Amino acid sequence: NAKPP
C-alpha cells in the first residue's frame, strides 16, 4: 500500500 510522504 502506497502511503503519502
UniProtKB/Swiss-Prot annotation:
The entry's keywords: Secreted
Localisation: Secreted
Listed GO CC annotations: extracellular region
Top-level taxon of origin: Eukaryota
Tissues expressing this chain: Expressed by the venom gland.
Broad class of where this protein is predominantly found: secreted
Chain's role: May act to induce hypotension.
Name of the protein in its database record: Cryptide Pep-24
